[in-house]
């Protein structure tokens, strides 16, 4: 295994944060904790339901970790939407993370997908059955155009996860494959469209800005995620089908060249994102900027990405990039480093156990006859 290119990663991260003029001021600490707990609490009760527990069959610790990660992402990034919208999006995106971590073959359960869809029957695939049940709670926040993007992008995501089941990084020379797969499983259109709830934006009035935001967010969001995930995925056997690794295979280039390709595309996308919306509707620009800054804060602070390890490694170094990275990291930590114990309670497993005990008590109650009830 090659050594992780720490200096290159620092330089790239610093340039990204400078390009977007990173300065997360989305919340006070109290507001952040309040929104985190609200979204988490509703989502935790959702996943503690017997139907969800039975059909998902996810390890409780993994489900808990997935939920905490997603609630952080949504609350930090969707800073302008209502708490109710945050909670419903948290549930939806937790479902996507659960699917992303799954290793089940979807083929058997997808044989009758369209027939069931057309007939209005419940889907055979348990993930689709649960996601479809929750979708109305998500879509009620959005107009028809944004809703269609959410539905379509979620379908693309499912297909992308299906492809990833084969651990296939593409054939050498298939230059379009890496970006095809990343767009498919990146949820870029779902994210881009879910920034514009109908209680804040008239999608007809802001149609051009929203359409452009969906187009731009498709790449920016996934490329930033790939860049900020590069460290945690570098030596993880489960994360070898990544955009960077697929660049190596399909473009037949070195890992350094693949990382440089991702870097240049991410930085270019960041420049575009800022420039395109600079003179547009101020509310649109504010929403996009809050998302970008919150999304970066989430990556820097969430334990899933292990970027605190980079910070600890370089905090005593005297290079310019190390100093800048540490300054940005500390800036993010000051606003976004909130211990899960402050907001992620009670745990899903605890709620599920309480529900199971309550159901058992109900089942054990004596059944009175109609005569006894009259008496």
Curated annotation (Swiss-Prot):
Catalytic activity: (2E,6E)-farnesyl diphosphate = trichodiene + diphosphate
Entry keyword set: Lyase
Any GO MF annotation of the entry: trichodiene synthase activity
Keyword flag Protease: no
Keyword flag Oxidoreductase: no
Coiled-coil annotated spans: none
EC number(s) per entry: 4.2.3.6
Pathway(s) it belongs to: Sesquiterpene biosynthesis; trichothecene biosynthesis
GO biological process: sesquiterpenoid biosynthetic process
Pfam families: TRI5
Note: Trichothecenes are sesquiterpenoid toxins that act by inhibiting protein biosynthesis.
Function text: TS is a member of the terpene cyclase group of enzymes. It catalyzes the isomerization and cyclization of farnesyl pyro-phosphate to form trichodiene, the first cyclic intermediate in the biosynthetic pathway for trichothecenes. It serves to branch trichothecene biosynthesis from the isoprenoid pathway.
Family: Belongs to the trichodiene synthase family.
Protein name, as recorded: Trichodiene synthase
Native species: Fusarium culmorum
